Design a protein with these regions (language model features):
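Active-site recognition of the HExxH zinc-binding catalytic motif
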Residues: 83-97
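Metalloprotease/metallohydrolase-associated module, dominated by Zn2+-dependent proteases
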Residues: 1-81, 97-136
Length: 136
């Protein structure tokens, strides 16, 4: 069965929210798209990020853009925490210049860095919730 791609508005909403909450201010939400794929033969891949390379940007006269693809067979069975970590991981591949290129795994997009961002996110959410309860 060939891979099929479907729009994923719920993933897009989560990605936009994570980019804001994680303070990834270099990410331009209107140029980050999200799809769900079905039929992939990948066994270890949970999600992928695709960039619109400079040559295509120039030829098509388009701005830098990224597409985050989640592989439904694996991603959908994960816990909510692991799904968030996965999306953070993919967002961390987007460089500060939002140029269409990628940051590498080695030295930046590593588990410990993803976990550090996720831990800060959880801490910020808890503080926000506590503040909300305090002022009610």
């Amino acid at each position: 069965m060939p891979i099929k791609y479907f729009e994923a508005p719920e993933i897009k909403k989560q990605v936009d929210q994570l980019a804001e909450e994680c303070e990834f201010y270099h990410v331009v939400p209107q140029f980050v798209f999200c799809v769900r794929s079905k039929g992939s033969k990948a066994r270890r891949t949970i999600a992928r990020i695709h960039g619109l390379g400079r040559i295509w940007q120039g030829v098509l006269n388009l701005p830098p853009s990224y597409t985050i693809e989640v592989i439904s067979e694996i991603y959908d069975r994960m816990s909510a925490d692991d799904r968030e970590r996965t999306l953070i991981h993919e967002l961390m591949h987007i460089p500060g210049g939002f140029s269409g290129g990628f940051r590498p795994h080695k030295g930046y997009v590593e588990r410990r860095n993803v976990d550090a961002v996720y831990k800060k996110l959880q801490s910020d959410r808890a503080a926000k919730k506590q503040k909300k309860l305090f002022f009610q």
